[in-house]
């Protein structure tokens, strides 16, 4: 017979049949991946207050893009997310991807370059928001819904085999591999 019955927040009943009570609570093993993905997207941080990390750093590493002639330059200003079109249950039922539309704001600076001196002066500045595509969102369970199917990301640890020494018999040399 069960010694203790616990109702957790997920609606599941956990029964204990052991003699010793649990000493440590079960850790949330998915929390690391959820926090990492939230830190990558930085959806809850205002665009002008985002640190140069995650998706912000990815865009900053590509921009600014300068024309070969030096007559134009494209700068990254910010990115933003629109709300998702469907919730998780609708995406599972309709075979859709649970995602949010990603829009970035870019600034195009056109220069007027003097042919003789090579001096640049700003001719025109245009700023526009551009739809980049839909970015999959992680659910509260730590999964992604892609075309109506739940997918997970499994972290792997790649260990190097260490140092391996080899000795050729009859020679005075040794070789080593890392």
UniProtKB/Swiss-Prot annotation:
Its EC number is 2.7.7.6. Keywords: DNA-directed RNA polymerase, Nucleotidyltransferase, Transcription, Transferase. DNA-dependent RNA polymerase catalyzes the transcription of DNA into RNA using the four ribonucleoside triphosphates as substrates. One of its GO terms (biological process) is DNA-templated transcription. The RNAP catalytic core consists of 2 alpha, 1 beta, 1 beta' and 1 omega subunit. When a sigma factor is associated with the core the holoenzyme is formed, which can initiate transcription. This is DNA-directed RNA polymerase subunit beta. Pfam families: RNA_pol_Rpb2_1 (PF04563). The keyword Transcription applies. InterPro entries: RNA_pol_bsu_protrusion. Belongs to the RNA polymerase beta chain family. GO terms for molecular function: DNA binding; DNA-directed RNA polymerase activity. It catalyses: RNA(n) + a ribonucleoside 5'-triphosphate = RNA(n+1) + diphosphate. GO terms for cellular component: DNA-directed RNA polymerase complex. It comes from Liberibacter asiaticus. The keyword Membrane does not apply.
């Amino acid at each position: 017979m069960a010694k203790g019955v616990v109702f957790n927040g997920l609606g599941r009943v956990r029964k204990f049949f052991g003699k010793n009570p649990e000493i440590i609570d079960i850790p949330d093993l998915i929390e690391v991946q959820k926090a990492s993905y939230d830190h990558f997207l930085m959806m809850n941080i205002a665009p002008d207050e985002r640190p140069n990390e995650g998706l912000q750093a990815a865009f900053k590493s590509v921009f600014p893009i300068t024309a070969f002639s030096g007559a134009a330059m494209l700068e990254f200003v910010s990115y933003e997310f629109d709300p998702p079109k469907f919730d998780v249950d609708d995406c599972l039922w309709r075979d859709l991807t649970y995602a949010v539309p990603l829009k970035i704001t870019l600034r195009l600076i056109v220069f007027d370059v003097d042919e003789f001196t090579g001096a640049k002066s700003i001719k025109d500045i245009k700023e526009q928001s551009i739809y980049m595509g839909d970015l999959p969102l992680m659910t509260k369970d730590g999964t992604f819904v892609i075309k109506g199917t739940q997918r997970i990301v499994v972290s792997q640890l790649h260990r190097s085999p260490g140092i391996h020494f080899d000795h050729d018999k009859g020679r005075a040399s040794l070789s080593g591999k890392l």
